[in-house]
């Protein structure tokens, strides 16, 4: 099951994962603020954890997660007679850390799932404490109806009026008395086909596992009236409590109280990472040794980097004038914006994007579409920018948001964004690794530099030198049909030739390599 809750004002997508259920948080914001500051050193560089460190969560975050779980477990309704006090388990923490490091939006590992419960949460954008996810899991209680004893004959019905309630039931499962969580910063996570540049990933593992089919999460009754004998009659805040169970883990030195983000890397590796896509190396043979013999690396960009003052009239030349990268701080620029919705060609590209609401003052990517002549342009004040009115005919343009979409090795432009006159804006796509090994019958490459729209986008990108076999970001631009597509062998891939394809157009795959994309805003 997959659960999405949209908060209209913040345009936020929520997703949380209990066993066999997924969940996350996507606020429309530009910075990770306080949380990311924890993971940066004094020079502003990402902090690199020491290999010997085992902790993947700070003591303060650990304690807040644990305290909130116990608080919520003690206040269930109807009251629980056998709800056990929850303690921290370092082994569960380590297993959560191991899974968090995979940055996969699914439950795992498969070998542990039969014996543990698991809730997952993630967000990117503005700072959210880990307890935000815990509270959201619990808030599913509004859709859950507790099964009364007379309904359990012998199995209890599962009554959930919302999309999912299993996150809540795992949090309050009476016998799930141990918890261990980890937090990891994941770069370029694939979330339901969307790429999140910097996702903060929370994994919480529970033991013994909950959510057993046909069972209620706890026994109703007077608090602590049905505690297991091993608790010796102890009760704390409506929870069955065993003396000496409050801190079963060893405290760590303050300097080690920080989340592990990446493994130790040498300066040489860091320098290499700045010039290559940050993706995991595929296992096994990739064919890269052979491709080096005919390696062609494209450094041409479809998108253009512009300043706050650049006007579309100055910059828009040729077929590539559709995507621009704007810097931060354009609200302070004196550049003019003429019009509303439709902007005159002498308008600042970046300030028009802010005026329309595509970007904020942090900058980012914007798509531009030329719209031909308009008889007049209306002034308005939006998002901190006053635009100017003009009552003379002039050429115009509109702005739109640049989206990012993950695709497969077989995805084609014909499927993704077919050509439409005068032009089509395709999303920025993220190609997976190992597309060189994809079946060439299902992932064809037709052409050289300009490819037929029935070609595999990702294999064409490898062929063109836009990305390597490790995958990465690619921009594609549908263009009008071509009569001839030329075959060639480049970067380990043979492309096909084709002449006079009926009704087909070409795709111009021009570079946007991963290290050339600045995802400051995720826009």
From Swiss-Prot:
InterPro entries: Allrgn_V5/Tpx1_CS (IPR018244), CAP_dom (IPR014044), CAP_sf (IPR035940), CRISP-LCCL_domain (IPR051957), CRISP-related (IPR001283), LCCL (IPR004043), LCCL_sf (IPR036609). It comes from Gallus gallus. Residues 66-206 form the SCP domain. Residues 1-23 form the signal peptide. Belongs to the CRISP family. Residues 302-397, 403-505 form the LCCL domain. It is found in: Secreted. Residues 246-298 are annotated as: Disordered. Disulfide bonds join 308-326, 330-350, 409-431, 435-458. SMART domains: LCCL (SM00603), SCP (SM00198). Keywords: Disulfide bond, Repeat, Secreted, Signal. One of its GO terms (cellular component) is extracellular space. It comes from the Eukaryota. Residues 269-288 have a biased composition (Polar residues). This is Cysteine-rich secretory protein LCCL domain-containing 1.
